[in-house]
């Protein structure tokens, strides 16, 4: 998983509340277990009309085709649980979503997949959305190390994040990465276990 430290990027405004996971990535695209290729179908129902790009949808317009930050409204990621939702966002290039609040499962899945979900009050999200609407001047900076969002005018907006989740993103650690951090202890345990319980096969962790 890629580290998240400081991100300065185009922010796309999506002024829609209650964007559920089926709007993020429709169920018909969930047959794959690959994390790549899903970005093409991100927001499929809003992004395409009869198989053609909807020119009015924000991610179909420049400079937002290169957006890495999404600013939206309440209850983002609600609906059914599907890890494909953060996969689709990440495959498109989105590394940070800013909203007043998120559905819990989507919020948790985002961290596990290297996406930073930031909760900020609605009035601040509206200000950031106004910033994001300025086309080529819509760049925001998200500084996870200092826990601030920096607007184009230089104003710094602080945000809260669980310290452990912050540590994981800063160091690019997913569940497997966390396990591999303890590989020496795991290897010692396995060596001892082959002596005390030789009937169990030894587990060998993959090389870094």
Swiss-Prot record:
EC number: 4.2.1.33
An example Gene Ontology biological process: L-leucine biosynthetic process
Reactions catalysed, as given in the entry: (2R,3S)-3-isopropylmalate = (2S)-2-isopropylmalate
Keyword Lyase (UniProt): yes
Enzyme class at the top of the EC tree: lyase
GO molecular function: 3-isopropylmalate dehydratase activity
Keyword list, A-Z: Amino-acid biosynthesis, Branched-chain amino acid biosynthesis, Leucine biosynthesis, Lyase
Assigned protein family: Belongs to the LeuD family. LeuD type 1 subfamily.
Protein role: Catalyzes the isomerization between 2-isopropylmalate and 3-isopropylmalate, via the formation of 2-isopropylmaleate.
Name of the protein described by the UniProt record: 3-isopropylmalate dehydratase small subunit
Species whose genome carries this gene: Granulibacter bethesdensis (strain ATCC BAA-1260 / CGDNIH1)
């Amino acid at each position: 998983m890629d580290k998240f430290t400081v991100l300065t990027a185009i922010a796309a405004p999506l002024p829609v509340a209650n964007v559920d996971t089926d709007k993020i990535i429709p169920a018909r695209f969930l047959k794959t277990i690959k994390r790549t290729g899903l970005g093409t179908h991100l927001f499929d129902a809003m992004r395409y009309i009869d198989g053609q790009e909807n020119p009015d949808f924000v991610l179909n317009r420049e400079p937002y085709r290169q957006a890495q930050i999404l600013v939206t409204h309440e209850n983002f990621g609600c609906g059914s649980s599907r890890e494909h939702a953060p996969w689709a966002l990440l495959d498109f290039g989105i590394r940070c979503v800013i909203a007043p609040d998120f559905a819990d499962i989507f919020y948790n899945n985002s961290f596990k997949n290297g996406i930073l979900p930031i909760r900020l009050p609605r009035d601040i999200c509206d200000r950031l959305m106004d910033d994001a609407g300025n086309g080529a001047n819509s760049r925001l900076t998200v500084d996870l190390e200092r826990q601030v969002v920096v607007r184009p005018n230089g104003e710094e907006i602080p945000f809260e994040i669980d310290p452990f989740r912050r540590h994981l993103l800063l160091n690019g650690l997913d569940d497997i990465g966390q396990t591999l951090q303890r590989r020496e202890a795991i290897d010692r345990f396995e060596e001892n276990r082959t002596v005390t319980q030789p009937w169990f096969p030894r587990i060998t962790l993959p090389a870094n």
